[in-house]
Amino acid sequence: MGQSGLLQGTPMALKSTIYKAVLDISDIDHGHYSQHSLTLACHPSETEERMMVRLVAYGLNAHTVHTVCQGNASLSFGAGLSDPDDPDLRLADYTGRTRLWIEVGQPDERALTRASSRADRVCVYAFSPSADVWWSLIEPKLSRQSKLELWRLPSDDTRRLCTLAARSMSLQATLQEG
């Protein structure tokens, strides 16, 4: 049998699409002003909308490197959809302790309970039209999770984020009274 016969039936793994973003943040509420050069891997099963919500979550939490960890930490993108045990974003201090675990979308109860056991604080950024229904079903099961915060982003706004998505992006965000 030739070499091509060995490869028959072997599925080809799809690769993530790489996006580069320069994000200028002016967080007036926290006195945080910075520029971040970021690389985002968009998993083949991830939508651009979800990827852009991850970028928004980064911008909303960039100040935590200084306000929570006095600069002794890093906020980074996790494996996300590629690894269900890894957050979409993680703030880890230099001892390796996870100070903030960020999920995007509608994670299940088990994932949020596991995240709460591994991090000081867990934030979920829900954005789809079905997020309210998802939360009404999952909230009673998570009533003991004091570390958990839910942020509901309007789906009309998150869909508009897709118009900004490009393989190379330069974005500015001003945060005030948020």
Predicted regions mapped to residue ranges:
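Acidic-basic catalytic patches of nuclease active cores, encompassing PD-(D/E)XK
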Residues: D29-L81
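Short hydrophobic alpha-helical runs that function as membrane-insertion/retention elements
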Residues: W101-E103, R121-A126, E149-W151
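Conserved catalytic cores of phosphodiester-cleaving nucleases, focusing on short active-site segments
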Residues: L89-L91, G96-L112
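Nucleic-acid nuclease catalytic cores
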Residues: C123-I138
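A short acidic, amphipathic alpha-helical/loop segment
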Residues: A111-A115, L137-I138
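Domain-level recognition of nuclease-like catalytic cores that cleave nucleotide substrates
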Residues: W134-G178
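Extreme N-terminal leader/targeting regions
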Residues: G2-R50
